[in-house]
Amino acid sequence: MVELPANLIKATFLSRPNRFTVVAAREGEKLVAFLADPGRLTELLLPGAEVYLAPASRQGDRKTAYDVVLLRQNGTFISLDSRLPNRLFAAALQAGSLEPFKGYRLRATEVRAGSSRLDFLLQGDGHPPCYVEVKSVTLVRGGLALFPDAPTARGSRHLRELMALHSRGYRAAAVFIIQREDAISLAPNEVTDPCFSSTIREAAAAGVEIYAYRCHIDPVTVSLIAPVMVKL
């Protein structure tokens, strides 16, 4: 479980001038906020959408006074912070609540692998070292979570690095954290990124482990609650 910032401000989404900036309105005042999710989010960031902002903890040279934390759509809270899944994975690993990684502990983060960096290296007594790459998922259609919501050459490269590590005797896993509660299963987004879709199937066939988890989100906390089926 990860705690969200206290005293979130409910506002109405107006526009997204660039990938990392959101303009929202509250009681007639325009608020400019940083968005820590570079995805397209076109099915979420619709005019009039209910968003939740947190005052920036440090101003410094920032151009925005707020951070976008959540969006609420049809009663479902959705986290819009693509950095959060790594914290969720680390917390669940430490709590021993991730069945595929029982007996493992965190050894390192941002681990060099070929021309990339992978999120985690795990170790455990009597277990082979395990490299893990975590991906944030926000797009869900009719209970089916889809990744990615925009083409991601980086995502395909990470999968190829995991395949190379597995071929050298390491465990290698891609973990998709669905930052909402209404997903039943996860699949690659074939239409948006056919290259990633074919690469993840190739990776799974080569022995890379693929997992997906959905989250429970409220205005106070976010927690991983259950694995969901992965459809490749």
Swiss-Prot record:
A GO molecular-function annotation: DNA binding
Residues making up the signal peptide according to the UniProt record: none
Disulfide bonds: none
Family annotation (CDD domains): SfsA-like_bacterial
Transmembrane segments: none
PANTHER family in the cross-refs: SUGAR FERMENTATION STIMULATION PROTEIN A
Family under the similarity heading: Belongs to the SfsA family.
Name of the protein described by the UniProt record: Sugar fermentation stimulation protein homolog
Species per Swiss-Prot/TrEMBL record: Moorella thermoacetica (strain ATCC 39073 / JCM 9320)
The encoding gene: sfsA
